[in-house]
């Protein structure tokens, strides 16, 4: 069943029309849902407590905030990168 659906989607793609393929890919993608203020606040509090989550803690945070574990994992990855960037900018500013 799943395989037949995948074949149907492939049939919709037209190698001679990359723009149509791009539009099709964009329309089938999951809509971006920003986090609520409450979710962001709770994720930030958790991040201040610990920059890295165990699998069990990630499951708990996701359950409490009504997010997927993947969303929590990626939020933490992005937050660590943001912190790394902020620290780099701070040290660059201090050195100049």
From Swiss-Prot:
Gene Ontology CC terms: nucleus
Disulfide topology: none
Domain of life: Eukaryota
Record's subcellular location: Nucleus
Primary location group: nucleus
Assigned keywords, A-Z: Developmental protein, DNA-binding, Homeobox, Nucleus, Transcription, Transcription regulation
Gene3D superfamilies found in the cross-reference section: Homeodomain-like (1.10.10.60)
UniProt similarity note: Belongs to the Abd-B homeobox family.
Quaternary structure note: Interacts with Geminin/GMNN, which inhibits transcriptional activity.
PANTHER family: AGAP004664-PA (PTHR45970), HOMEOBOX PROTEIN HOX-C9 (PTHR45970:SF1)
Protein name (database record): Homeobox protein Hox-C9
Gene name per UniProt: HOXC9
